[in-house]
Every structure is written in C-alpha cells, then in structure tokens.
A protein has these predicted regions:
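Auxiliary Fe-S-binding modules of radical SAM enzymes
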Residues: 1-18, 50, 64, 71, ...
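Short polar/acidic secondary-structure junctions
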Residues: 15-16, 30-32, 109, 146
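Canonical Radical SAM [4Fe-4S] cluster-binding loop centered on the CxxxCxxC motif
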Residues: 18-64
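Short hydrophobic-acidic sequence motifs that mark active-site Asp/Glu residues
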Residues: 22-24, 82, 142, 180
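Short strand->helix junction
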Residues: 32, 90-91
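Conserved alpha-helical substructure of the radical SAM core
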Residues: 45-82, 95-99
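Short glycine-rich or small-residue beta-strand-to-loop segments that form or flank ligand, phosphate
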Residues: 83-88
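Conserved AdoMet/S-adenosylmethionine-binding subsite of the radical SAM
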Residues: 93-233
Length: 258
C-alpha cells in the first residue's frame, strides 16, 4: 500500500484533523524511518520497508531550520496553530530531543507566542527523566495507548523492544494530567487474525486505564490514509461516537476524528 516519509527537519505546514495548521518538526532524517513501534497502520510504512542509515537530526539542525521557517511564516502573515514534533518515527528516541524541545519553546515564545508545541509519541521513552521533563514543557503531550491487551499490542503496534503496558499506564499517570491519550480504533484482518479493538473486551479495560491516567483529554481516531498492510478498515462513526461518550462520562474531554 502507498505510504510516505516526511521532509526533514521541518515539514509542512499541513492542516491536521486534530491540531489545526501544524508545522512539523522531524527529528529523523528524511531518508528513512526510526521507530520503537512498527504499527501496521502507520502512514510512514513498516520499519523494514523504510530502513534508515543516517543519524538523528541534532537539536542545532532542527532549531536553525525551525527558526528560519517561523520567520518565513511570520513574514507571510500566517503562523502555525501548533509546532508538532512527529516525523518519520518516534521523536523522543532522538538523543537530542530534550534540547530540541527546550530550544523550540524559546523560539516559540520569541517568534510565535500564540502557537502551541505538541509532541506525538508512542510513549516508550516517556519514563526517562530527561524525556519526561521535556514532555512537561510542551503544551500538548500526546501519548499513544491503542489498547491495554498485551497480545493485541503485539499484533497492532508491534513494539520493537520489550513493552509492559502496566508500566506505560503508570508512566502516563505520572504526568499528573499533563497528557493527552491518543488511540486508534479500527477493524479488519492481519496475518489471518482479526483486527478490531472496538468491542467491549478492549474498550472496557482501556477506559479503566484512562480512569487511572486521568488525562487532560483523550483523542480517538481511525484509519484516514492508506496503510502499509492490506485488510485494515475504518471504525464506523457511530462506534467512535459511542466510545467518546463513555470517555466523556468519566469526566475526560474526548476529541473524535472520523
């Protein structure tokens, strides 16, 4: 299936379904993907299909490019709603991610004070003190929790290394509400196994995890672009709405993208 890589170190701005006008920051090189997950729905493709043989971008490279782009956008009269650290893989795995965040906050305050800073992360490095501290600095700390079922995590997200969902929930809770939980709901089949996390056996325990984490918000979405594997399909809008209503019943705001 058709997938794509982002430009580096800056891409966009693009109109995000969830974030508005988003200026992307890519800690990874443009030539490949570096991720601690290998999600079968990833718009950047599977890891093996996008091998990367270059190092992560340094904070200096990222910040120089970010400053230039913000100045260009200011001159054109349209600054981004959000500066989003995302790109071709897991941004928090970059060695100089904390320095890049600290510098981006300074640039934002100077050049685009009304813009938010967001990080889209799978959360696998969020327990590291320097990463945790950096994520506390951003406006939207968006961490992924697609399910709490260990077997389904292995099928859907395919973590590259050890992954303990209980540890992840505890880590996410340690942000004391300064976290947005992002979850994809989808249906289909992969390797002869059903892909569907919309049923009660998945939704119920996921809601229980949200109660423990107490995020400032949850954002749920479904497949919007082509995926690297065949056989995946959108969750129905009415299913997403029903899940969102249950999140909201917990006192947690929930944003839905169909």
């Amino acid at each position: 299936m058709s997938t794509f890589l982002n430009a580096s170190p800056i891409f966009g701005p693009v109109r995000s379904r969830r974030l508005g006008l988003s200026l992307g920051v890519n800690m990874m090189p443009a030539s490949g993907k570096i991720c601690t997950f290998d999600c079968i729905y990833c718009e950047n493709g599977l890891n093996a299909e996008r091998p990367c043989h270059e190092p992560y971008n340094t904070a200096a490279v990222v910040l120089d490019a970010l400053e230039a782009k913000l100045r260009e956008m200011a001159a054109e009269g349209e600054l981004p709603d959000v500066i989003t650290f995302a790109g071709n893989g897991e941004p928090t795995a970059a060695p100089e991610f904390p320095q890049a965040i600290a510098g981006a906050v300074v640039l934002r305050d100077q050049l685009a004070p009304n813009s938010k800073i967001a990080v889209l992360s799978n959360g696998t490095r969020a327990d590291r003190p320097e990463v945790h501290d950096a994520l506390m600095m951003v406006d939207d700390n968006i961490l992924k929790l697609d399910t709490v079922d260990p077997a389904f995590i292995q099928l859907l997200d395919q973590p590259v290394g050890p992954y303990d969902v209980e540890h992840q929930i505890e880590t996410f809770a340690s942000f004391n509400g300064h976290v947005i939980i992002q979850t994809i709901f989808l249906t289909g089949e992969y390797q002869g196994k059903p892909i569907d996390n919309t049923g009660e056996e998945y939704v119920g325990p996921w809601l229980a995890a949200l109660e423990r984490i107490r995020p400032q918000e949850a954002t749920i979405y479904t497949v919007a672009r082509e995926t690297p594997v065949a056989g995946l399909a959108k969750a129905a809008p009415e299913v997403l709405d029903a899940i969102a209503a249950r999140v909201q019943a917990l006192g947690i705001p929930c944003q839905v993208s169909y």
